[in-house]
Structures are given as C-alpha cells and as structure tokens.
C-alpha cells in the first residue's frame, strides 16, 4: 500500500468528500481544492496550505494516476478528480460505507465508531454503531495491507479510536496530541452547519470565477 504525505491525504479526502456532498461543483479547481483543504469545519488539524502547496502534491498524485486533470474543451481553469479507489484497473475497491469512514479519518484524524457514525451522515448511512464497527473491522482485517488500526483506549474514555494507515504507522502519542483539539467540539449540529457554510463558500468561489471568465471574453 502506498504511503501518502499528510497534505496528499488531505487532498484525497477533500476530493472524496466534495464528490459526494457537492457533485455539481466536482471536479474541483485548484482554488476550490485549496479552500476545501483549509476548511475550519470538519478538519483536524486545520491547515493553512497555499495553492502552491496543494498544486505540488496534486502534480505528484497525477504522476501516479491517483488524481487526474479533467479540464474540458477551451477551459482555462484546471479541474481535478480523484482515482483513489473503485477504478477499472485499480486494485483498491471500497463500498460506500468503507469510503465514507476512510474519508472522515483522512480529514479528521482518529475517531471512535460513535463519532464516525455521526460524522459520516452526509456521506453515507449507518443504521447503528455496530455497522460502523463491522466496517472498521473489515478495513483492519487484511493481514498484508490493513487500512485502519484500533488504537489503545485512552484513560477515562468509553470507546477506543481508530486511525487510518495510509500515512504510515500511527503512534499513540501522536494520535493523542492530534485528537486533543477536537475534544472541545460541543455538538455535531453546529459542525454540520459549518460544513454547509463551507460548501456554500466553494460555490460562491466557482460562481465568481465563472463570471470573471465571461467578462474576459
């Protein structure tokens, strides 16, 4: 299994997320992709990537056909889509639920099954936490190439968290430090509203670009 950088996995996670939640805006322009990477909602850690940072990683992923440039016709604006999984010749095949779980792990770091059930609501449906646990167990069951790992339960916590392995092995210390900020999130309704606002901002950016292109002609 290829090991990705943190920036690469953030980009892949954003493309997966936007493909599902805002298909009318997908594939994404570089500007929209950078905005998605740096969202303050549904991201942990929050990043401040530049267009150049994102483009460098996008170009590296294009070289490996994990991302493709889907620029059409006479358009002067490049648009990107992922080929992370479920492609005709690719070996990685994922169900909608598996893809949703990995997407949230890519974007928000280690999560409990309960958190994953709540935070995947805009991506897929889970009837209960047990279904999430079954998906996680399946993703971790591959002896030669496990996709996720169950972390040791933290003191005072009811549930153990799971982390993805696409950026390499996860140390308990690193996972704990990265999770600390998200423990202050008070309720998922506010987070969902923030995500909707972020999606609207993306649409506004795309409309601005379209208007500018029309004015230039």
UniProtKB/Swiss-Prot annotation:
Question: SUPFAM superfamilies per the record?
Answer: Winged helix' DNA-binding domain
Q: Which InterPro entries match?
A: DUF480, WH-like_DNA-bd_sf, WH_DNA-bd_sf
A Pfam family that the UniProt record links to this protein: DUF480
Which family is annotated? Belongs to the UPF0502 family.
What is the designated name of this protein? Answer: UPF0502 protein VFMJ11_A0613
């Amino acid at each position: 299994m290829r090991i990705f950088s943190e920036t690469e996995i953030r980009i892949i996670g954003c493309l997966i997320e936007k493909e599902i939640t805002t298909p009318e805006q997908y594939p994404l322009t570089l500007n929209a992709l950078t905005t998605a990477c740096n969202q303050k909602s549904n991201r942990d850690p929050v990043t401040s990537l530049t267009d150049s940072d994102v483009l460098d990683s996008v170009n590296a992923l294009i070289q490996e056909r994990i991302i493709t440039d889907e620029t059409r016709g006479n358009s002067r604006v490049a648009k990107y889509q992922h080929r992370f999984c479920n492609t005709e010749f690719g070996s990685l095949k994922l169900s909608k639920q598996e893809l949703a779980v990995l997407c949230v792990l890519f974007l928000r770091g280690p999560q409990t099954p309960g958190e994953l059930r709540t935070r995947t609501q805009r991506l897929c449906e889970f009837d209960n936490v047990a279904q999430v646990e079954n998906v996680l167990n399946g993703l971790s069951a591959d002896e030669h190439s496990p996709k996720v790992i169950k972390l040791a339960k933290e003191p005072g916590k009811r549930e153990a968290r799971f982390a993805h392995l696409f950026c390499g092995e996860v140390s308990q210390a690193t996972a704990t430090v990265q999770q600390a900020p998200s423990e202050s999130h008070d309720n998922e309704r506010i987070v969902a509203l923030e995500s909707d606002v972020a999606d609207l901002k993306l649409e506004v950016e795309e409309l601005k670009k379209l208007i500018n292109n029309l004015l230039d002609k």
